[in-house]
Regions:
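Active-site-facing alpha/beta catalytic cores
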Residues: 5, 13, 17-259
């Protein structure tokens, strides 16, 4: 045992006992270091799955609510077939209640919001009675994205995760909304495991070539796949980063893809 311990000490594996100390790491991505959120596992051998998972960093709250059992199908709110306005109304009500809970206002609710303005680096919300209100926690408002032709996105932050309220009064959903909100984007899948072993078995040379080709496309950012879905020809490719104007006038880039 002494010879073994000496060997471990000689190669630097064992060190003499020392006083208490702390270890500090650097250059660790915030997705690993401080952001708590969902993680996806996907077979990288399937390019469409790999693209979908990587792009799941941001997702539509309206779509997620409409297409799942988070919203009941009772009293005519079924989700099959074309757009169901009864279900759509429930989705929007749920989403705005979520905004009220996550980004509470000093007075009123998002359900009664009719307009958003930017005054002295703050967001001012007009309610349907004509009164003005602000966020209870003004630090939750982060920035703004101009999308042209009167459309814009409002960026908020809670627990290190971002949410974008998308305003577009020309959109079919935004047209019927008091504040012109067409959707709410939620920062969702923070990290993705691109799997080569557990969710897929890549064992021979052909399989491994597919895996590494897809992985190279992810690393270079040029992976894309085209396919036919319900008679429509679609192309899936990687999302770009999201650019916002901060309250202080500076620009910020947020990742458009999961780590």
């Amino acid at each position: 045992i002494n010879e073994y311990k000496k060997f471990l000490a000689d190669i630097g594996y064992l060190h003499p006992r020392s006083n208490n100390f702390s270890i500090k790491t650097s250059n660790v991505d915030p997705e690993i270091r401080k952001i708590a959120g969902p993680q996806l596992v996907v077979p990288v051998m399937n390019a469409r799955f790999a693209l979908n998972a990587t792009n799941a960093r941001w997702g539509s709250l309206y779509d997620a609510l409409y297409g799942t059992d988070m919203i009941s199908e009772s009293e005519g709110a079924i989700r099959e077939g074309g757009y169901n306005p009864i279900r759509g109304d429930r989705v929007i009500a749920f989403a705005k209640n979520f905004l009220d809970e996550t980004f509470p206002l000093e007075n009123g609710t998002f359900n009664k919001a009719t307009n958003f303005e930017f005054i002295d680096s703050e967001i001012v919300i007009t309610l349907n009675d004509g009164s003005k209100t602000h966020l209870l926690n003004k630090d939750q408002y982060i920035g703004y994205m101009d999308k042209g032709e009167g459309a814009y996105g409002l960026l908020f932050k809670n627990n290190n995760l971002h949410i974008e309220i998308q305003v577009d009064r020309s959109h079919p959903i935004g047209q019927d909304d008091l504040a012109g909100i067409k959707d709410i984007l939620v920062e969702s899948a923070i990290t993705t495991i691109q799997d080569c072993e557990d969710s897929v078995a890549a064992v021979d040379d052909e399989d491994k070539i597919i895996v590494y080709r897809n992985w190279l496309g992810l690393m270079k950012g040029d992976l894309k796949r085209s396919f036919n879905k319900n008679g429509k020809y679609l192309t899936r490719e990687l999302n770009g980063d999201r650019r916002y104007l901060l309250k202080n006038g500076k620009m910020i880039l947020l990742p458009g893809r999961s780590l």
